[in-house]
């Protein structure tokens, strides 16, 4: 709908009157300039769920700025977590775009449920920066030890991730044995160490490279990796959407 055409204003109004959901990802203020403030949208249709996805949110100082996934990854600290040779690097997946969309979906579904129970619509102000910043959190509750329940051990052929448990006693037992475990790991390959730990009832997993993941039988069996032929005849390993209906 091109809102620069006055006739389209009436069209959008009629669409809002009948719609359950309105989703838009224009710069904040775009709809407002044409009279479609959140308040006016709810006045047109009190039951509508209006979800606005933007880079920085309705009222932020940077609200009027455009936002791209890479920009948000830098501002949210994601690129600081994914350094390559010490240099901040964008994740392969457009994670800021993806998570903003996912959170918008969850919020919209929750708002629809609320609407069905109360008859009241909702305005969802969802910022990409908020969604991307949320991804960087390393602890998931107020326990100062909660982020310390995993350890990474260096092996002959890479690294192994070990879960030591979230309670204080488990952490204490691990601290007593950690030096010996680290020494043992240095002389052991990942597969042998993981097997030995699992036999003792300890959760462990090899930390794999992307190339190893693509070749992993478990990944292949699930069909998440598939081969596709390019126009030049070359064959590429690609990843399909994990949703399989």
Feature-to-residue mapping (PLM):
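General beta-strand structural signal in soluble alpha/beta enzymes
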Residues: 24, 52, 206-207
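Rossmann-fold NAD(P)-binding glycine/threonine-rich loop
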Residues: 32-80
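Short beta-strand segments
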Residues: 2, 51-52, 127
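A structured beta-alpha segment of the ubiquitous adenosine-cofactor-binding alpha/beta core
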Residues: 1-43, 186
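C-terminal capping/gating helix-and-loop segments adjacent to ligand/active sites or protein-protein/ligand interfaces
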Residues: 237-245
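Alpha-to-beta junction loops
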Residues: 18-19, 46-48, 199-204, 219
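Conserved beta-strand edge residues that scaffold enzyme active sites
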Residues: 5, 29-30, 55-56, 167, ...
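Acidic, glycine-rich segments within the central catalytic cores of soluble metabolic enzymes
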Residues: 59, 68, 73-196, 204, ...
């Amino acid at each position: 709908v091109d809102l620069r055409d006055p006739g389209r204003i009436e069209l959008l109004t009629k669409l809002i009157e009948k719609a359950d959901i309105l989703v838009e990802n224009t710069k904040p203020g775009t709809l407002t300039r044409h009279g479609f403030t959140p308040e006016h949208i709810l006045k047109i249709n009190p039951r509508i769920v209006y979800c606005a996805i933007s880079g920085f949110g309705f009222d932020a100082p940077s609200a009027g700025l455009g936002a791209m996934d890479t920009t948000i990854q830098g501002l949210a600290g994601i690129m600081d977590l994914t350094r390559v040779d010490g240099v901040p690097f964008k994740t392969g997946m457009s994670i800021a775009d993806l998570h903003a969309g996912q959170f918008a979906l969850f919020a919209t579904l929750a708002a629809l449920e609320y609407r069905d129970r109360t008859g009241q619509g909702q305005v969802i102000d969802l910022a990409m920066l908020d969604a991307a910043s949320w991804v960087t959190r390393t602890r998931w509750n107020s326990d100062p030890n909660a982020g310390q329940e995993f350890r990474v051990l260096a092996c002959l052929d890479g690294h192994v991730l070990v879960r030591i448990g979230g309670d204080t006693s488990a952490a204490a037992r691990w601290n007593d044995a950690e030096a010996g475990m680290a020494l043992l790991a240095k002389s052991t390959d990942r597969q042998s160490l993981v097997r030995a730990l699992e036999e003792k009832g300890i959760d462990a997993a090899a930390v794999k490279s992307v190339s190893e993941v693509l070749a992993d039988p478990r990944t292949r069996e699930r069909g998440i990796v598939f081969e596709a032929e390019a126009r030049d005849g070359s064959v590429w390993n690609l990843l399909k959407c994990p949703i399989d209906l």
